[in-house]
Amino acid sequence: MLDAERRKCRFLEEWAPPNARVVWGRAEEQERDGYGVAVAKALAPPPIAAEWCLPLVREGGAVVLWVGPTADAAHVARVAEQIAAELAEQPPGFLVLRKTAPTPPGFPRRMGLARKRPIE
């Protein structure tokens, strides 16, 4: 579990199951291609959340975005393609992105850039 707020991490450390790891930090600072799954809920608009989460996941892994009814799946799919992934499933309320190759050079972008200049 990754969160930029120390207060939330302390709470998670107390209540997380023993097989879960809590990391205090930002997605842009984490190891590339190191995790099997990343799940994002209320992190950012779905295309930005995809850009932050996909570099964390290794080839063959998945990113699960918890989204609202107005999420633009086509836009998220375009972003995913640029970061070596594809839109695999769309169960109600979620978008599942499957990582198809290692993270390309240039990702994750510098801190704040995804929000300032989102991928179209």
What do the PLM-derived regions correspond to, one by one?
Residues 1:
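Short beta-strand "acidic-cap" motif of Rossmann-like dinucleotide-binding folds
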Residues 4-120:
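S-adenosylmethionine
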